[in-house]
Amino acid sequence: MNRKIIAQLFGSLLGLMFLLTLMTRAQDKPPKPDDPELDRVQAMISQAKKESGQFSKSGSKASEPNNPNLKWAVTLWEYRNKHPGTPATAIATTEALRLLVRADRISEMQTKADTVKLDEAAWKRAIYVLVEAAANKKDYNYLISKTQALSQTAVDPEIKVFAHITLGEAYWKKGETEQARVAFQAVVAQYPKTPYAEEAEGNLMEIELLNPGQTAPQFARTTIKGDPIFLAGFKGRVVVLKFWGT
């Protein structure tokens, strides 16, 4: 397997890990369902998902103008404009942006996202929408720009650190490892002893030791039988690595 293929496989794996990590983080606790407006917004979202599922099953393309996601994106955005600053509005904002991504309207989503103030609570979930859009188009420039701004000016500390580590991951996915390193180091320094710092430390270790094309670290050991083994001894030979945990 040549280096180009290895790099491609590594890139695909990194992208999958990137999305899975962010999706895992997204499993935060939803707002308490004691607000009728939350129920109202959730009902709209449920109906949008139902109609979107029917649209997909019909074989229609996401970019078609009759995609119901477009209709519901408009409806949810209108709700946002009429009810600013509420928990329900934060959810409506995120879902409106997400539906535009699902309808392949990335530019329109970005235009609307630019109207969401950096101090809004909606960013706690809306960042995931930007990640999804970036992964779909394999274009991380907008995600980098927005998370960079949020990491500097967001009011909510959780949004701020989340934006910062997402910024590092976006740089990493784009292939700008030095910029990613700087972002991850900032997370470790500014948010010590947090899950985000632990994740950033793990990412830094991968950048340092596991990037394709890097020189493998030298080592010399003995087997359980007492035979010497060293890296140079494997040159030109097929090697099977077996890992196990205890």
Where are these regions (language model features)?
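N-proximal helix/coil linker or "cap" segments that precede and/or mark the start of modular domains
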Residues: 173, 179-222, 232-235
